[in-house]
């Protein structure tokens, strides 16, 4: 989609599953389960989308999905599904990791910043080596010191 000198692409990094009750909180299950049917473990399907923006010679990526650094236990818990993954979707649009100028994370939950890094020789290194990463200061502080209630999201 184009809007003036802005070009937008919605990229999908697949889906994962989370507990429906945790997602909908005080909304009764009979209400939310009509629009988001849970599986046998009470998990609902959640999509992971990123937004690629090109403007003024800059390439901006908003959110980076869940990434690929998951152990078997968490793969089972979250039931990640879907192809192609974010790197392949970027490549299909002619974008290499080193072409990304800015990565914006609205917050740092695992399903929003997973591709911020990739593993090289057992170490996490920036996936987008030339990018400036942008996140709210308070969110960064909270991610480093999460509460008991939300520590699993980081």
Model feature map: region roles:
Residues 1-95, 99-111, 127-154:
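Metallo-beta-lactamase
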Residues 67, 109, 139:
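Catalytic metal-binding/acid-base residues of hydrolase active sites
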Residues 62, 106, 135-136:
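Active-site flanking residues adjacent to catalytic metal/cofactor-binding acidic residues
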Residues 113-123:
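Metal-dependent catalytic neighborhoods of phosphoester/phosphodiester hydrolases
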Residues 20, 71-72, 114-115, 144-145:
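Short glycine-/acidic-enriched loop or helix-start segments at secondary-structure transitions
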Residues 16, 111, 141:
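Surface-exposed, flexible loop/turn segments at secondary-structure boundaries
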């Amino acid at each position: 989609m184009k809007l003036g000198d802005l070009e937008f692409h919605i990229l999908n990094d697949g889906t994962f599953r989370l507990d429906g009750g945790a997602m909908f909180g005080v909304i009764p299950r009979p209400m939310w389960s009509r629009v988001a049917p849970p599986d046998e473990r009470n998990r609902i399907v959640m999509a992971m989308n990123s937004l690629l923006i090109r403007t003024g010679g800059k390439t901006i990526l908003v959110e980076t999905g869940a990434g690929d650094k998951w152990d078997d236990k968490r793969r089972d818990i979250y039931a990640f599904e879907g192809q192609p993954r974010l790197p392949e979707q970027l490549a299909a649009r002619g974008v290499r990791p080193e072409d990304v100028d800015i990565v914006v994370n609205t917050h740092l939950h695992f399903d929003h910043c997973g591709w911020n890094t990739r593993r090289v020789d057992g170490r996490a290194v920036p996936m987008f080596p030339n990018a400036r990463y942008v996140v709210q200061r308070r969110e960064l502080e909270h991610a480093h010191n999460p509460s008991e209630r939300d520590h699993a999201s980081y």
